[in-house]
Amino acid sequence: CSVGWKEIRAAASHYFRIEESVAADGVRVLSSPLENDPRVLSGESGAAGFGTAFELLFHKAQYQEEISSLGLNSESVLLFFNTEGVTDRKNFLKIVWEGAFAEKV
């Protein structure tokens, strides 16, 4: 993993360290689409990027500095690569049906 991280770090302009709840929110939102959006079944690793964007944009007031640094605005188009399907069905159901790793309000 340290070899891969060196390459990513050299090429990436931003990165985030996230809580389990952020990745789990990504799993939940992707599996429960609105209107005509396609349903995406993903594990936590695959949904982490989407979950991060969802967290930033759903809580804009809290993350204004990060959103500005990324240059995100109403014209932005985001592309996500899901790198993991549902490899652990039991954990997937805990997240989606039972609310595992839900953020405490």
Segments predicted by a language model, with ranges:
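Active-site-adjacent helical/loop segments in soluble small-molecule enzymes
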Residues: 1-70
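Phosphate-binding loop/pocket of nucleotide- and phosphate-handling active sites
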Residues: 50-105
